[in-house]
Regions:
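Conserved SAM-binding loop of SAM-dependent methyltransferases across substrates and taxa
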Residues: 255-267
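Conserved alpha-helix/loop element of class I SAM-dependent methyltransferases that forms part
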Residues: 229-244
Length: 318
């Protein structure tokens, strides 16, 4: 029997009685050095500082008939390596079971005294991640960080996109004696250093609530610059059939009303608002900021002269 165990922050005391018994009865125990260091002195199993499935499977093959326990940080079901081992174990017909642990999101939630069921959960640890798009679409976003993506680097990306005022909470070394909670705006946190074991919660309280195509005309900042009216915008977005990752052009963007709606409809894409009139360009900037349309890029110039240098579009509004 191979038992896959979520060890939370790495404390033996945090394991369930079932998980502790599985470790004590195992002949082999696998895990990162940090997790193996949390085992009690009376744990007599042979310990292997291995966590890659191929390495574990090879060692199991060299020790047939022995029960094993494999330790994972956090919870086995939350961006864990457990699934990467469980699949080949089942394919090989090796009996396996899973005991979950306490994830970092639960630890941060408990430290803050707040529920987490409404948070969007995103991994920036070894995964492609667009923090700007996530925070454009969700009021509260929890980032699991690691590797090259730290709380500071994610907050810097938000700041560069114009979301520096978003509220941030960083939890360091959660569930340990060194646990620290830090608060600040994204701009403030971008310039700080954090422990390797850190997570980030970003809350964008100014997230616009308008989502259905065709925002009311009065919701935009206006002047004498012409603006595409609500009914036309709604019909245009329906006809363009915008996808979340699209690259879009709005040529002759005016107040930026169409550009803003395109940007919010394609949060993981880019919208290029082409406009040559200075007054209109200023309105586009203001509406971009009002709606947090961080993926809206203003191109100041006259079409078609400025179009040659833009990425090829998936759809164009003129």
């Amino acid at each position: 029997m191979v038992t896959l165990i979520g060890m939370g922050s790495g404390k033996w005391e945090a394991l369930s009685a079932q998980a502790q018994q599985a470790v004590r009865s195992a002949g082999l125990v696998f895990g990162a050095k940090r997790l193996l260091a949390g085992l009690p002195a009376d744990c007599t199993a042979r310990q292997f500082a291995l966590y890659q499935p191929a390495d574990i499977l090879e060692t199991l093959a060299q020790n047939p008939g022995q029960d094993a326990a494999v330790l994972y940080s956090g919870d086995t079901g939350f961006y864990s390596g457990a699934s990467g081992l469980l699949t080949p174990l089942r394919a090989l017909g090796i009996p396996a079971r899973v005991y979950p642990g306490v994830s970092s999101i639960q630890l941060l939630s408990a430290a803050l005294g707040r529920p987490w069921q409404d948070w969007k959960l995103v991994s920036a640890h070894g995964c492609a991640c667009d923090p700007v798009a996530e925070c454009m679409m969700n009021r509260s976003v929890y980032f699991l960080t690691g590797g090259t993506e730290t709380p500071a680097s994610l907050c810097q990306k938000l700041t560069d996109a114009g979301m520096g005022e978003a509220h941030g909470v960083v939890g360091e070394n959660l569930g340990t004696e060194a646990e620290t909670i830090r608060y600040g705006s994204a701009a403030e946190l971008a310039g700080q250093s954090f422990a390797p074991l850190s997570v980030l919660l970003v809350e964008n309280f100014d997230l616009p609530q308008l989502r259905a195509p065709g925002f009311p005309d009065e919701s935009f900042i206006r002047s004498e610059v012409p603006m595409t009216k609500q009914e036309v915008r709604a019909a245009a977005l329906a006809k363009l059939a915008v996808m979340p990752t699209d690259t879009l052009w709005d040529v002759g963007a005016g107040t930026g009303s169409v550009s803003v709606e395109l940007a919010l409809a394609a949060p993981k894409g880019r919208v290029y608002a082409v406009e040559c009139e200075p007054d209109a360009c200023e309105l586009i900037r203001k509406n971009r900021a009002k709606f947090h349309a961080c993926n809206l890029i203003l191109i100041e110039g006259r079409a078609p002269d400025v179009l040659a240098d833009l990425p090829a579009p998936d759809a164009v509004f003129i």
